[in-house]
Curated annotation (Swiss-Prot):
The keyword Metal-binding applies. It comes from Drosophila simulans (Fruit fly). This is Protein ref(2)P. A zinc finger (ZZ-type) spans 122-173. It comes from the Eukaryota. Residues 3-88 form the PB1 domain. InterPro entries: Autophagy_Rcpt_SigReg, PB1-like, PB1_dom, SQSTM_UBA, UBA, UBA-like_sf, Znf_ZZ, Znf_ZZ_sf. Residues 386-413 are annotated as: 3 X 8 AA repeats of S-A-N-Q-S-X-X-P. Residues 291-319, 412-423 have a biased composition (Polar residues). One of its GO terms (molecular function) is protein kinase C binding. The gene is ref(2)P. Keywords: Cytoplasm, DNA-binding, Metal-binding, Nucleus, Repeat, Transcription, Zinc, Zinc-finger. Residues 550-595 form the UBA domain.
């Protein structure tokens, strides 16, 4: 029968390696086993003597302690084929002494934070706050003063709080920090460094003209010695208000531009007097006097005098606008803006309404002015000569003097009997009878800021309309008898027209012609009432005649509908606008809204 052996593994404390050994199988007594293990390890191997514990590792890799005889018998039963006992010391050898030494060393290595023995000693440096010399701990050096240092206690007490302080944790500051802040001149070492072209000194040469006057030799010597880069930077930062005045000095030649901008505020003000407008356009209109004398009538000189104290429509500064907007878009833009400004001024001013409603359409001229109106439309918009431009303003007062008073007496009773229902719907749209003759031509003048070129373009189309909006002529006595505007009727007219447009698109060709006749007869009431202001009531055939603005029937109907709503077709701008959108009134209103918001 082979002899049984017991394997033991001992892992002692300290750097010694693990020891594996075999023992002959001792008796079945656990006490004898412990004695033989201690004899082998501590006497034969001469290992440091200590209390040991015995255990074994089962199949689950768990440590099973062997403490008494019962545990030893279980070990023999479980590990009969492979008996292996693990031996380990209960505690490290001389553990109490080691812990005491480690604790004492830890206390020695981690002293208190406020212990001065842990701080760096800055030799030959004295605290200017408390007089501590040498300075111990963190050294706080003032950046703006020549030689001012504080210890960490004085700095924590917020001494010298008005200047920037630099914290120096180590004692190598005099060689590095002084080169940055104080510059050369601190001794032979600094002199040698400055002779080697110190990079901090090259960019720190101050301009002789910018140097302030030194009062004494001490200040001049201090400036020579302490002329570092950061000291110059600190002086520049502290003297920022002085630097801003010198920086703005060369900007004085630009003051005339600022003065010109302050003299011409019409673009920002909603309402401007004619005096401000003439001042703003005085300079740009001087080189254009030759052209104005040749093309514009001489009646414009007395026009400006009576309007000098009365408010006008908003003025557009074309000097700045012409630099942004191309010239080809200026014409239509000016027409749209002027019409909008006149219409809104008419709607806002309650004392200027009278019996005319919101806006006077362009067909309120007399019978004498109607023939040149048709001739100018047939011959083209841009073919009007300078003679016709000067003749229309001069002929308008005489026509108004002879026709307007008779129209006020005879037009109303004849129309009220025939088309009373239509007159009720279009009451806010009826034109206002003119009361003055001399001020009519004065109000026809455009805003004062327009150049003569734009005035010529407007005068070319002035033959189409002899009456513009009167913003200055008011009748305060007739104010209590003014009818209230009914904007609901305007919306109803627009809705009816949109419904007619929808029906025209869905119906056949025969139905379209029938609806065209219906729309033309409904819109003819407005033209009849406007044409009958300057003339006596005509025959029934004359009332049904409607001026044709476009060959396309749909665009022509749209023009009449928008004129009934208060828009003017002066210069045929409304015809061009509706032609671009194929007679779609909502699309035309959107285009005008977008152009107005952009401007």
């Amino acid at each position: 029968m082979p002899e049984k052996l017991l394997k033991i593994t001992y892992q002692g404390a300290g750097p010694q390696k693990k020891i594996n050994a075999y023992l002959r199988m001792p008796s079945q007594n656990y006490t004898i086993l412990r004695r033989e293990i201690e004899l082998y390890l501590f006497q034969e191997r001469q290992l440091p003597k200590c209390d040991v514990r015995t255990f074994w590792i089962d199949a689950d890799q768990d440590e099973i302690e062997i403490v008494n005889q019962n545990d030893y018998e279980i070990f023999l039963a479980k590990c009969e084929s492979n008996m292996h006992v693990q031996v380990a010391p209960l505690a490290p050898i001389e553990e109490p002494k080691a812990t005491k030494q480690e604790g004492s060393s830890a206390n020695a290595e981690a002293p208190s934070v406020d212990d001065p023995s842990n701080f760096t000693i800055h030799d030959s440096v004295q605290c200017d706050g408390c007089g501590l010399a040498p300075l111990i701990g963190f050294r706080y050096k003032c950046v703006q003063c020549s030689n001012f240092d504080l210890c960490q206690k004085c700095e924590s007490a917020h001494k010298h709080p008005e200047h920037l302080m630099l914290r120096m944790p180590t004692n190598n500051g005099p060689g590095m920090v002084d080169a940055w802040f104080t510059g050369p001149g601190l001794g032979r070492r600094c002199g040698r460094r400055s002779r080697g072209h110190c990079p901090f000194q090259e960019a720190s040469q101050p301009a002789p003209a910018a140097e302030p006057a030194r009062d004494s030799r001490r200040e001049r010597r201090h400036a020579r010695r302490h002329a570092g880069v950061l000291s110059q930077f600190v002086e520049m930062m502290t003297n920022l208000p002085l630097n801003t005045t010198t920086a703005t000095a060369p900007a004085e030649p630009q003051k005339p531009k600022a003065a010109e901008q302050t003299e011409s505020p019409p673009q920002a003000e909603p309402t401007v007097t004619a005096e401000k407008a003439t001042e703003s356009e005085a300079k740009p209109t001087e080189p254009m006097k030759v052209n104005t004398d040749q093309s514009v009538p001489t009646t414009e000189d007395p026009v400006t005098t009576p309007r000098s104290t009365e408010p006008t429509t908003p003025v557009i500064n074309l000097d700045n606008l012409s630099q942004i907007v191309p010239p080809e878009y200026m014409r239509a833009g000016i027409e749209i803006l002027n019409n909008f400004s006149e219409m809104f001024s008419k709607m806002i001013d309650t004392t200027d309404v009278g019996d005319s409603g919101i806006f006077a359409p362009s067909t309120t001229s007399s019978a004498e002015n109607k023939k040149p109106e048709e001739q100018s439309q047939s011959s083209g918009q841009s073919a009007a000569s300078s003679a016709s431009q000067s003749a229309v303003p001069s002929a308008a007062p005489s026509a108004n003097q002879s026709n307007v008073p008779s129209a006020n007496q005879s037009a109303t009773p004849s129309i009220s009997g025939s088309i009373s229902d239509a007159q009720l719907e279009t009451e806010p749209l009826n034109p206002k009878p003119l009361e003055t003759t001399t001020e009519t031509e004065q109000d026809r003048r455009r805003s004062d800021s327009l150049d003569p070129e734009w005035q010529l373009i407007d005068n070319a189309y002035s033959a189409n309309n002899s009456n513009l909006i009167n913003l200055d002529t008011t009748n305060p006595t007739a104010a209590p008898q003014q009818p209230v505007r009914d904007f609901g009727q305007l919306g109803e007219l627009l809705r009816q027209h949109m419904n007619e447009e929808a029906r025209v698109e869905q119906a056949s060709a025969n139905t379209q012609t029938a609806q065209v006749d219906t729309v033309s007869t409904s819109t003819s009431t407005t033209s009849v009432t406007t044409n009958s202001v300057g003339t006596s009531p005509a025959a029934p055939d004359d009332k049904r005649t409607v001026p044709v603005y476009h060959t396309d029937e749909r665009i022509n109907q749209s023009i009449h509908a928008m004129m009934a709503m208060g828009f003017s077709n002066e210069g045929a701008w409304l015809t061009q606008l509706l032609e671009s959108v194929q007679g779609n009134i909502p699309a035309a209103l959107d285009v005008m809204h977008v152009s107005q918001t952009r401007n």
